[in-house]
Amino acid sequence: MVKLISNSTILLSLFLFSIAAIANAQQCGRQKGGALCSGNLCCSQFGWCGSTPEFCSPSQGCQSRCTGTGGSTPTPSGSAQNVRATYHIYNPQNVGWDLNAVSAYCSTWDANKPLSWRKKYGWTAFCGPVGPRGRDSCGKCLRVTNTRTGAQTTVRIVDQCSNGGLDLDVNVFRQIDTDGNGNHQGHLIVNYQFVDCGDN
């Protein structure tokens, strides 16, 4: 009888532990509108937060805060395919690369960065399906590829948008619109990948 109660207690404890773990699980990524995991955890291909290689390895389909080895140090990561990219006339070269002059959302945090930082990459607004939002996206870099032609470039996020993708500076848009189809349609279809800006 004592052994039966002991086994029942163990099974009940395991059951309650499992329910608690499920209740505390956090969803992220495209399954949760691009949400990031708290505590710098990685977002798995299935939209769950964790810190093991199954969650953090790009080869396992990690969506954000991925690492090369599955450790806990976040690196710029996450990607999306077939995203709409429109253009915005920032023309930063005409305003001295001044984020305040174009009323960019990220100017609150990045307007006083060195000129070399502000002009290192073309500018974009970001509201893509995968990646950080708001202040957390400011200053991050994306490798953007035109799906039609394969032309690609790296851009820096300086603003927000509402088109569900990217709003590239017109100069960047033209740079990857190598066949003119984007200009004709008023948008491009692109893939993007978060990459290290190399700012150190």
From Swiss-Prot:
InterPro entries from the UniProt entry: Barwin_CS (IPR018226), Barwin_dom (IPR001153), Chitin-bd_1 (IPR001002), Chitin-binding_1_CS (IPR018371), Endochitinase-like_sf (IPR036861), PR4 (IPR044301), RlpA-like_sf (IPR036908)
Domain Barwin intervals: 78-199
Domain Chitin-binding type-1 as annotated: residue spans: 26-68
Induction comment: By wounding.
Gene Ontology molecular function: chitin binding; RNA nuclease activity
Transmembrane domains' residue ranges: none
Gene3D superfamilies the UniProt entry points to: Endochitinase-like, RlpA-like domain
PANTHER family documented for this protein: WOUND-INDUCED PROTEIN WIN2
Protein name: Wound-induced protein WIN1
Organism: Solanum tuberosum
Taxonomic placement: Eukaryota, Viridiplantae, Streptophyta, Embryophyta, Tracheophyta
